[in-house]
């Protein structure tokens, strides 16, 4: 198996957590559906092919730097005399992510080539969150192996974290571990779709020591939980 490692450092990022219409909260990392959707856009895939790509690629992410959390407030004008409801949007300014994708050689190589010469402009999240490479060689293909590890820097599966873990801080700008329901797939019914979620624990600025070694994929030696 081979993998694709993509290092990005956008000016801003927003990955909406869909639970409140007046608070546009954000995951502090690109969810699985967003990251694979970014590849699908770069590859110029229609919806049906995007659905197929979701089944062909595994995904993991390391939050190298969460960036600065920014709150943006706006009021939408409706009609004269109507009550005004301010809407708050959470953004992350200049975060730094390492995205990991694993799958069949043909699929991974096609995704890699698409990032170098995309059909559509890659976005990370909403339409204001443009994809910015973190460095010149921002995408690379690496060897991937199965393994077990207890020292992890990537987003962790919630079930493994709940068995026991401790967070070791390495940087001043950090995020303490917090559980999220990350969208990992979609169920389609007619013209509509519904997200499928998985419990994960995200953090930044350090690493997690799990109580027990867990199954991971090693991307050129880097242990990553893949969903």
Give the ranges of each region predicted by the language model.
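Residues in well-ordered beta-strands of folded domains
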Residues: 7, 60-62, 100
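Internal, well-folded beta-alpha domain core
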Residues: 64-227
């Amino acid at each position: 198996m081979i993998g694709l490692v993509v290092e990005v450092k956008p000016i801003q990022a927003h990955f909406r957590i869909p639970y409140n219409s007046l608070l546009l909260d954000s995951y502090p990392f690109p969810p699985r559906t967003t990251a694979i959707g970014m590849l699908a856009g770069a590859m110029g895939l229609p919806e049906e092919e995007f659905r197929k790509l979701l089944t062909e690629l595994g995904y993991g992410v390391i939050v190298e730097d969460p960036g600065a959390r920014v709150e943006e407030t706006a009021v939408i004008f409706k009609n004269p005399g109507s009550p005004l409801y301010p809407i708050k949007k959470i953004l992350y300014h200049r975060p730094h992510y390492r995205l990991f994708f694993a799958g069949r050689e043909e699929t991974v190589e096609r995704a890699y080539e698409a990032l170098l010469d995309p059909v559509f402009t890659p976005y990370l999240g909403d339409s204001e969150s443009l994809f910015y490479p973190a460095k010149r060689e921002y995408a690379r293909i690496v060897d991937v192996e199965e393994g077990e590890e207890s020292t992890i820097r990537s987003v962790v599966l919630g079930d493994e974290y709940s068995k026991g873990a401790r967070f070791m801080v390495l940087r001043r700008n950090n995020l303490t571990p917090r559980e999220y329901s990350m969208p990992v797939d979609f169920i389609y019914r007619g013209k509509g779709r519904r997200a499928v979620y998985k419990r994960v624990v995200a953090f930044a600025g350090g690493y997690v020591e799990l109580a027990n070694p867990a199954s991971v994929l090693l991307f050129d030696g880097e242990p990553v939980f893949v969903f």
